[in-house]
Amino acid sequence: MKIALFIHQPVCAVDSANGIIKALSSQHSFKLFSKDEVESTFFDDVDCVCFPGGFGDADRFDTLVKWNYDAVKHFVSNGGKYLGICMGAYWAGPDYFNLLDNIEVTQYIKRPNTCTRRPHPKAMPVKWLDNFERMYFYDGCTFVGNNMDIVASYSNSDPMAIVQKNIGLIGCHPESEQWWYDKKYLEPHWHQGTHYQLLLDFVNRLQ
């Protein structure tokens, strides 16, 4: 399928976008867009819109997306797939695109019984389907509600990756590249590319 990938440094970062392309390009193609208004036909040949992760305040949403807000909403409401990773997952929530049915998107580090209260990069212990993984995390989100398919969970059992119909959201970074793990405490947790396959399988789950 063809994926429209939003990029705006640093909030929806090139680093995350590059990892997404690396993980998915064996089966999917891409076209890019940013904060400038797209043409009315931009989404006509697109199957999925993707908002990656990055750095900064999620509340920059209004500035960055205002010219394409209606086009994205229309695309998803008409069955187009939405993939959100970290920042992109936050943006699916009720304060932003408001795409979800009775699901709140919130910071994992502020939830009860979390394994960390610090947002800095770490290899987060998660359970992805039936397997335990250490996945790159940078102040990612979790999801509160019942109307979702849970693909992965944090160690406190809060959802980390979910699917609701045509919407797929991930709090951690399966698209992370090897250089993201350059700190000594992260080096042992480089996934050797296995998380790319998890992301590819996840995207292929979307209805």
Feature locations, PLM:
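N-terminal beta1-alpha1 cap of cysteine-dependent amidohydrolase-like domains
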Residues: M1-V46
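Short, solvent-exposed loop/turn segments at secondary-structure junctions
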Residues: P10-V11, F55-D57, A89-W91, E104, ...
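Hydrophobic/aromatic beta-strand patches that form the interior of the parallel beta-sheet core
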Residues: K31, L83, N98, V151, ...
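Short, well-ordered alpha-helix to beta-strand connector turns
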Residues: V46-D47, G79
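Structural motif
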Residues: C48-G54, I167-G171
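A glycine-rich, often tryptophan-bearing local segment used as a flexible ligand/cofactor-contacting loop or short
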Residues: D57, F61-P125
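Extracellular ligand-binding/catalytic regions of CAZymes and related secreted enzymes
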Residues: K73, Y96, P174-Q207
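Catalytic beta-strand/loop cores that center a nucleophilic Ser/Cys/Thr
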Residues: R117-W180
